[in-house]
Design a protein with these regions (language model features):
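Serine-esterase "nucleophile elbow" of acetyl-processing enzymes
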Residues: 1-41, 51-60
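Acidic/histidine-rich helix-loop elements
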Residues: 11, 36-45, 73-77, 160
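Alpha-helical cap/lid subdomain in secreted, periplasmic
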Residues: 31, 49-184
Length: 184
């Protein structure tokens, strides 16, 4: 698991984030999978790319989940750079023999409609080019909760960026169907 604060339990008690919940689900399903959470709060695709080779050598994973890119966008980094880094990470993981699940994100509307649409689309493009599995939006049903503005912020910490503990089961529910397909 290569991700940022959304996967590194930022602001949560240890063992309550969606990756820890995934590990418990895998155990309950009696799937012989070991989860290595190499997520770092604040990480970008460049940071993930620079760490990936060492992680692949050290752990020799059969599956790699990549949840990166949100911090690139929040920092206003060029979308082509983000896409290139995601492509390189996906290809490196696949070259090592791992199946890849790419987890997409979306940007708030204040980044502009065009930027947001292009950012969202780059995940689908990377997944398609590399024939990788894709979860289009990790925060589906959380950041885009139905109803009024209060509904869409109630599942977030005070910073309105990081989900509260009660949102993490929903995040796992967004990931599990696609992950289960590639675990077979």
């Amino acid at each position: 698991m290569l991700g940022d604060s959304l996967s590194a339990e930022y602001g949560l008690k240890r063992g309550s984030g969606w990756v820890a919940l995934l590990e418990k689900k895998l155990q309950a399903e009696k799937l012989p999978v070991t989860v290595v959470n190499a997520s770092i709060s604040g990480d970008t695709t460049a940071g993930g790319r620079s760490r990936l080779a060492g992680l692949l050598t050290q752990h020799r994973p059969t599956h790699v989940i990549i949840e990166l890119g949100a911090n690139d966008a929040l920092r206003g980094l060029p979308l082509q750079l983000t896409e290139d880094n995601l492509n390189q990470m996906t290809q490196a993981a696949q070259k090592s023999g791992a199946k890849v699940l790419l987890i997409g994100m979306q940007m708030p509307p204040n980044y502009g409609k065009d930027y947001g649409a292009r950012f969202t689309a780059l995940y689908a493009a990377v997944a398609k080019i590399n024939k990788a599995a894709l979860v289009p939006f990790l925060l589906k049903g959380i950041a885009d909760a139905p109803g009024n503005a209060a509904d869409s912020t109630r599942l977030f910490q005070a910073d309105r960026i990081h989900p509260k503990e009660e949102a993490h089961p929903l995040m796992l529910a967004n990931v599990w169907p696609e992950l289960k397909k590639i675990l077979k």
